[in-house]
Amino acid sequence: MHLFRFEGRDERHDESRTLQAGDGPVALATPFGRLALSVCYDVRFPELYRALGEFDALFVPSAFTVPTGAAHWETLLRTRAIENQAYVVAPAQGGLHPTGRRTYGHSMIIDPWGDVLGVRPEGEGIVLADMDLERVREVRARLPANLNRRLH
């Protein structure tokens, strides 16, 4: 939905030059549970996930730059898992692209409590983790934060 713009010392990016912003949040019901979908830069906008309502897992495929990824990637993903009390699955491109752009990588899976269940720091590979809907229910029962929200 959101288009990335970054001006660093040695690099700058403006996705609006080549991409079009999305229209709205996306979630779908599956046999696993309710899944929310977003892309990369969207992870910086918590109001997007509030607009989606309650979901069991969030998928955030990304291509974070090295400077923004090193500083913010894991923190943002763990925060989204904790505040939504849902799994976060974040496949991430990493390495040097033909254009010279370098992306951060660090694909990971995080549980609803914010614990990192699996991570692939760099290079090609697969991240696997057990994801259990009972864990989502357990976390929400132990800390019913969404029931205590006063702003909607």
Regions found by a protein language model. Give the residues of each.
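CN hydrolase (nitrilase-like) catalytic-core segments centered on the catalytic cysteine
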Residues: 43-127
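Short acidic, gly/pro-rich beta-turn/loop elements at beta-sheet edges
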Residues: 8, 47-48, 117, 138-139, ...
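Short, well-ordered beta-strand micro-motif
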Residues: 27-29, 109, 128-130
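Active-site catalytic loop in hydrolytic enzyme cores
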Residues: 1-53, 66-75, 142-145
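Short loop segments at secondary-structure junctions
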Residues: 31-32, 112-114, 131-134
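A short C-terminal boundary segment appended to hydrolase-like catalytic domains
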Residues: 134-152
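Active-site/binding-pocket entry motifs
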Residues: 3-4, 65, 95, 135
